[in-house]
Design a protein with these regions (language model features):
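Phosphate-binding loop of NTP-binding sites
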Residues: 60-63, 72-184
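N-terminal leader/targeting and accessory segments in enzymes
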Residues: 1-93, 97
Length: 184
């Protein structure tokens, strides 16, 4: 059992999945969301014994983290992120965290336009070919939740520009970059 403290910021699909995986890997987990957490995510977190809070950030708990998993919608300029940065607490993404705990092949698709169509088509082709494949990222379920609760040999992952932030050691087996426009 690890006594390392993981703080997850954001209680949506990405954050909830990361919190469940961290809990199952033996981390001391705290999830915090400045907004309201949907009931389905509260139920998921409760079912795995993950402690959480909503509509606030308890700084003393967040700033005691050994590592922070940040959901893609949280800007680096948010006050809590600035405080985390000043303390040099490592910040990673859900995808980065999940990648540590699976040997599955990763097919990652990013770019400005055509990501979802290409991701869904790739998933369909691989599934039709008889592969044990999961769909994650911007479409499908949280990669971390799937790594925690399911087994797939291949994951097809749609990655937005925001999801690419805070990824450092994650390695895709296949990487596809669609069109890139100035807004990305």
């Amino acid at each position: 059992m690890s006594n390392r403290r993981i703080v997850v910021l954001g209680g949506g699909e990405s954050g909830s999945g990361a919190a469940v995986l961290a809990k199952l890997k033996g981390f001391d987990v705290w999830l915090s969301d400045m907004g309201a957490i949907k009931d389905k995510y509260k139920q998921l977190l409760d079912s795995y014994g993950v402690q959480w809070e909503e509509k606030t950030h308890t700084e003393e708990k967040i700033l005691a983290a050994d590592e922070v998993i940040k959901s893609p919608g949280i800007p680096d300029k948010a006050p809590i992120m600035q405080k985390i940065a000043r303390l040099n607490i490592p910040v990673i993404s859900e995808i980065e965290f999940a990648g540590r705990y699976t040997d599955a092949k990763m097919v990652c698709i990013t770019g400005s336009n055509g990501k979802t169509t290409t991701t869904l088509l790739t998933y369909h082709i691989l599934q039709s070919a008889g592969l044990n494949v999961g769909l994650a990222g911007n479409v499908g379920k949280s990669l971390a939740l799937q790594v925690a609760t399911e087994h797939h040999d291949v994951y097809v992952i749609e990655l937005s520009s925001f999801q690419l932030d805070n990824m450092y050691e994650f390695k895709a087996n296949v990487a596809v970059i669609m069109n890139i426009t100035p807004d990305h």
